[in-house]
């Protein structure tokens, strides 16, 4: 629906956790399932990463990993990036801003965000958040959610989720403005075949 209005090369993508894989694929990365299978042999207890045993499960058979040339920058938060070595990341030629918590117990920082920051062909801006866990990037919980989902809602002592989110918003705005240029009103793409209305 929004595709015809996207300015080519001016699209910024934000990916969190497994969404980081999606953002990387859209920006030119090629999934390498052999890497995931090898990782799961080394760390079989990582149930979240290895529950499919290195098999890529698509919602529909026609879905295939494909880059989108309109993507001009990516912001990744606690990205799951086990699928990508240097060769698989060679096609990612856009600026990247990466955040991860140094106390992430769900997505191993050393094999994901940290390794990704070393391997991307365009050196990213990599920021490690002291004391933060995997779920610090999720919305602040209300009282009921804190009781029902404590693992998702409780942060370590000294970690202020609201403050982190405010910082992320400011830093993301600066990053995307620098990477993509100042925001401009998007017009319907001529490639969509729809005529543009003339202003009078």
Question: What are the functions of these language-model segments?
Answer:
Residues 94, 108-119, 141:
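Short alpha-helix in the alpha/beta-hydrolase fold that links the catalytic acid
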Residues 22-26:
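Hydrolases whose catalytic domains are alpha/beta-hydrolase-1, hotdog thioesterase
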Residues 82-83, 103-107, 134-135:
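Acidic catalytic loop of the alpha/beta-hydrolase fold
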